[in-house]
Amino acid sequence: MESQIRQNYHHDCERAINRMINMEMFASYTYTSMAFYFSRDDVALPGFAHFFKENSEEEREHADKLLSFQNKRGGRILLQDIKKPERDEWGNGLEAMQCALQLEKNVNQALLDLHKIASDKVDPHLCDFLETHYLNEQVEAIKKLGDHITNLTKMDAVKNKMAEYLFDKHTLGGQS
């Protein structure tokens, strides 16, 4: 049954929103995996764990906003299976940050693709929603991860575990 409130909301936009919800949930799931990897007793980097847990919560909030938007526009929510993260072990902090950067770039590209669909279908509400709540935030997240990667690389944190520990404690605020 078609929604009585639906207006100028193309079915391609509706389908793309459902795919984006899944991608945000996948990102949240991946960050949850990272967070609990870094809080293991044999890894014990609480700053990394906290950083990735916060990212997980943020991605979940993004999915929730999309779910609400879908309902406000009269679309239908069609949830899909959430894919398991590519890995179970995340290695060192630098490696995990590099994986997180790629994940954020993938999410950003999906948002840009969604914006293009909205623009092509002349949906100013969806364009405004994405511009207001997502696009700039993605660029900021990518920049922050890039900065962390640069600093971990400069510190040679892969070979120097003390540098990784200090980054965890002082940059990410880890409490030992």
Swiss-Prot record:
Gene3D superfamilies: 1.20.1260.10. Almost exclusively in the gonads. GO terms for cellular component: cytoplasm. Its EC number is 1.16.3.1. Fe cation 2 binds at residues 59, 104, 138. GO terms for biological process: intracellular iron ion homeostasis; iron ion transport. Transmembrane segments: none annotated. Coiled coil: none annotated. Belongs to the ferritin family. Residues 7-156 form the Ferritin-like diiron domain. Oligomer of 24 subunits. There are at least two types of subunits. The functional molecule forms a roughly spherical shell with a diameter of 12 nm and contains a central cavity into which the insoluble mineral iron core is deposited. GO terms for molecular function: ferric iron binding; ferrous iron binding; ferroxidase activity. Pfam families: Ferritin. Keywords: Iron, Iron storage, Metal-binding, Oxidoreductase. InterPro entries: Ferritin, Ferritin-like, Ferritin-like_diiron, Ferritin-like_SF, Ferritin_CS, Ferritin_DPS_dom. Fe cation 1 binds at residues 24, 59, 62. Stores iron in a soluble, non-toxic, readily available form. Important for iron homeostasis. Has ferroxidase activity. Iron is taken up in the ferrous form and deposited as ferric hydroxides after oxidation. It catalyses: 4 Fe(2+) + O2 + 4 H(+) = 4 Fe(3+) + 2 H2O. It comes from Salmo salar (Atlantic salmon). This is Ferritin, middle subunit. It is an enzyme of class 1 (oxidoreductase).
